[in-house]
């Protein structure tokens, strides 16, 4: 009997998994990928690079399918074969064998291919949900960082405006002290007198001390 093929894209299209969970309506993972491509971000962590190198150098025990199409009975999904190599918990429920359909094959930890496909679909759905949650957290973190930068910039500009306002007020106060228009150089007062607030209008009414 031919082995059924697994369509991963159909699983993410709104089909509920065994746990009854559905992917979120907003595709945060796609938004994160688009933002990553727009900003041209690349992962340069040593752990990720080492993992990528080991993955590329790893030799798979199963041969890859040829380029030309083969019959459905000879073609087996590579994702299922790769996933079957990983340790997985034994399934809780057993496949019903009394429905008249004998098991097509026996995998390690599974009674039938259908049971393995159901477990694989559940694992894929959980992985997609985790990816969506991580993408949503990263997008929210970027939004929070952007808001903090805006707040810091606004605070800096506010302090600059306050400093400029205080400086203008000081200049206005000083201009009030030296409001008289300058006459000829011979009739103008000296700079020290101006600093202590002496003008031509109040020089006769002010009292001075030599102490």
Swiss-Prot record:
InterPro entries according to UniProt: FAM167, FAM167_domain
Region (Disordered): 1-30, 56-108
Coiled-coil segments: 120-153
UniProt organism field: Bos taurus (Bovine)
Family: Belongs to the FAM167 (SEC) family.
The UniProt record lists the keyword Lipoprotein: no
Alphabetical keyword list: Coiled coil
Coiled coil found in the keyword field: yes
Record-given protein name: Protein FAM167A
